[in-house]
Regions:
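Nucleotide/phosphate-binding loop and acidic/charged catalytic motifs
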Residues: 156
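Extended, charge-enriched "interface" segments that sit outside catalytic cores
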Residues: 20-21, 123-126
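Single conserved hydrophobic/aromatic residue that forms the stacking wall/gate
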Residues: 415-427
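Short, solvent-exposed helix-loop connector elements
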Residues: 141, 245-250, 372-386, 397-409
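Non-catalytic, polymerase-adjacent accessory regions of viral genome-replication enzymes
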Residues: 1-111
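Conserved polymerase palm-domain catalytic core
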Residues: 116, 120, 135, 170-171, ...
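Amphipathic alpha-helical blocks
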Residues: 105-124
Length: 427
């Protein structure tokens, strides 16, 4: 526990007598800070990184008792707590309160928050339920935790991420450091572009992945403090002043939710390899089974439609069932590469033996609609205001698709934008 005297941190007392007895100097700092502004962030980052490297190494060596001890050491350190508070008070959601309406917007509030991040007696508040629009017109529910719960999740994420990164599937690309959708698409190109590459693709669609992951599976398999994890999973949510329980799924809207989902879905690549052979082995050449996943979207290639439907799909379904998940029968389909398929906003299709990747039709239409909505909303605005609204959307879409064959699509997009800007608007 951290000890304060008149707002000044004077020492740390460990609750674990095996790890420490009595008081000791905070190891991350040569001079303990006495305010938020006096924290040495270089020392904080160095301390956190050092412990994370040790956790990753222990995970690689499968020394799980050491992993647990190092995770406890990290989550009880002042450095990790300061890093967690900094993260939740500097990200985009820093001005969005939870059910308690509390924000940590001042240095004093951030400083006092350090003493509140402890597992003993911790009880998370219910999530504040809001809805955000989806491209198809429906709405997706999102839970907003309180600032304290966000910081606690950020704290435990520091200890969990080294484990998740060490055990992650090789071809998992979503919600991971230094990986992106462009990397996932590049791997698809590697798997499908050659003359003798697989020609059949299983497009996987998981029904409500984040909402349906089994709590029992998470509690049994996620390597972190089980009591804290259980409290997050069972916290429930508030909507229209009414409390609703949560019986399945990860705490959506929370910082730790994507990593929990990744941990649940990781392992499928190894299962596929055990059934159909590791990549670049004799067995894999016969089946041509390759796997690429970004968050809950994934594809699996295969040498034939029959292999994917009769052998691969049952393996995937069994893997998902263990985690409380099911595949959508209508959206999980097997497609020939000559017909093409959409993945992460791109369309991948072979034309006369050559694989071309370009923006998908749905993605383009969604983008054009967004531009049209901005123009219509700003029909009476000054030109500079409209430009300020349009530029981030135009540049964002162009940057996302800059790695693919998009010359024709970009030309069509420019024509549509010009037409929209020149057309008269009826008010």
């Amino acid at each position: 526990m951290y000890l304060f005297s008149e707002g000044r941190l004077i020492g740390i007392h460990s609750e674990d007598s095996k790890m420490s007895t009595g008081f000791k100097q905070v190891p991350a700092f040569s001079h303990p800070p006495d305010s938020w502004h006096t924290i040495n962030w270089s020392a904080v980052d160095r301390k956190v990184r050092g412990l994370q490297v040790r956790i990753a190494k222990a995970t690689r060596d499968q020394r799980w008792r050491k992993v647990k001890a190092l995770q406890r050491l990290l989550t009880h350190s002042l450095a990790a707590r300061a890093s967690a508070v900094r993260r939740v008070t500097e990200n985009r959601g820093k001005k969005t309160p939870g059910v308690d309406g509390e924000l940590w917007s001042t240095p004093q509030a951030k400083w006092l928050a350090l003493g509140r991040l402890k597992s003993k007696g911790y009880r998370p508040a219910p999530l504040r339920r809001v809805y955000i629009p989806k491209p198809d017109g429906s709405r997706r529910p999102l839970g907003i935790p309180t600032m304290r719960d966000r910081a606690m999740q950020a704290l435990y994420l520091l200890a969990l991420e080294p484990v998740s990164e060490t055990v992650a599937d090789r071809n998992s690309y979503g919600f991971r450091p230094w990986r992106s959708t462009a990397d996932a698409i590049e791997q698809c190109f590697v798997n499908l572009s050659r003359k003798h590459s697989a020609e059949w693709v299983l497009e996987g669609d998981i029904k409500g992945c984040f909402d349906n992951i089994s709590h029992d599976w998470l509690l049994a398999n996620v390597p972190m403090d089980k009591q804290v994890l259980k409290k997050w999973l069972k916290a429930g949510f508030m909507e229209s002043h009414r409390l609703y329980p949560t019986e399945a799924g990860t705490p959506q809207g929370g910082i730790i939710s994507p990593v929990l989902a990744n941990l649940a879905l990781d392992g499928l690549e190894k299962v596929l390899e055990s059934h159909f052979g590791k990549k670049n082995t004799k067995a894999s050449y016969k089946t041509k089974v390759n796997y690429v996943r970004y968050a809950d979207d994934f594809i699996i290639t295969g040498i034939s439609k029959e292999l994917l439907e009769n052998e691969v799909l049952p393996v995937v379904s069994a893997f998902m069932a263990e985690r409380g998940l099911t595949l959508s029968a209508s959206k999980t389909v097997v497609t020939h590469i000559a017909e093409g398929f959409d993945f992460l906003g791109q369309n991948l299709r072979k034309y006369n033996g050559k694989l071309l990747i370009k923006p998908s039709r749905k993605n383009l239409q969604r983008h054009l609609k967004k531009i049209k909505d901005i123009v219509r909303r700003n029909c009476m605005s000054r030109q500079d205001v409209l430009i300020h609204q349009l530029n981030p959307v135009l540049l964002g879409w162009a940057n996302y698709h800059r790695h693919v064959v998009a010359k024709e699509t970009f030309g069509y997009r420019s024509e549509e934008h010009t037409s929209e800007l020149q057309s008269p608007v009826t008010i």
